[in-house]
Amino acid sequence: MTTIKVVKICGAMESRGLNPLDHLPPPASSNKPLTPFSITDILSKPTVKRFHRIHRLPASDRVRQSITVSRQTLITQASPLCALQELASKTFKGLELGVLQAAEGKDGLKLFGQRDSPKKRRKSRTAFTNHQLYELEKRFLHQKYLSPADRDQIAHQLGLTNAQVITWFQNRRAKLKRDLEEMKADVESVRSTGLVPLDKLAKLADLERCAAAGATGNPGPQCSPRLGHEYKTVHKLCLSPMSSLSDHTSQDCSEDEEVEIDVDV
């Protein structure tokens, strides 16, 4: 019967030119409001609506609603992205603090490890007088190594300390050794190209004699005198006051050979 009545009503309405769907009740509204899916609507609009609802609610309900919103805000702030941002911020703050402390000298050793110990300051070199150099060179010609008695005698005679005498003889032996090695290399290079000039052979022979003279610690023969230009050149090498001896700030003296030795006075 009900179906027949509905059909009759629909037929009567159609005969009058009316649409039966216009008289149907509106559909029940959904519990969840339809919202756009843009980032702005997702992040902003629900918060605005919540605040509008809070103002419309009574005072007691407003307090509860505000507590709920605060909890949701805390949950949002506790998201992984916020936690990562907070961790990065703390890390950079710690680094900035560490750099400032290191710049001010605070806890510098703890941050960057133990610092290297400062290098030992080199002692000032002695500038020998011409008289001292002459006597030292004359003694060096026939005695390359000094006994303790000879060392004390020279130091007392020239007004030097035992350490200064020892250091000078060490540097002088190193200088003679370098001169001899350079002369040998020069002779070998010339020999490979052809005949060796006699003056180079003469210089090499006299340098070897000077190196061998007094090498055992006992006085030996001096450089053998030669006539002509060869003897003058070699004698100049053996006797000339060198820049490394007159001014100990020069680099001619070997740094490896210059060793300070403790001497019992």
UniProtKB/Swiss-Prot annotation:
Keywords associated with the record: Developmental protein, DNA-binding, Homeobox, Nucleus
State what the entry records as the consequence of deleting this gene.
Morpholino knockdown results in decreased myod1 expression in the fin bud of embryos.
A GO cellular component entry from the record:
nucleus
SUPFAM superfamilies in the cross-refs: Homeodomain-like
Tell me where it resides.
Nucleus
Disulfide bond positions: none
Q: List the Gene Ontology MF annotations in alphabetical order.
A: DNA-binding transcription factor activity, RNA polymerase II-specific; sequence-specific double-stranded DNA binding
DNA-binding found in the keyword field: yes
Residue numbers of the DNA-binding region are 121-180
The record's Gene Ontology biological-process terms are: convergent extension; muscle cell differentiation; regulation of transcription by RNA polymerase II
Chief location of this protein within or outside the cell:
nucleus
Give the matching PROSITE patterns.
HOMEOBOX_1 (PS00027), HOMEOBOX_2 (PS50071)
UniProt keyword Nucleus present: yes
Query: What Gene3D superfamilies does UniProt report for this protein, alphabetically?
Result: Homeodomain-like (1.10.10.60)
Q: What does this protein do?
A: Transcription factor required for the development of hypaxial muscles.
What this protein is called in its record is Transcription factor LBX1b
Q: Which organism is it from?
A: Danio rerio (Zebrafish)
Q: What lineage is on file?
A: Eukaryota, Metazoa, Chordata, Craniata, Vertebrata
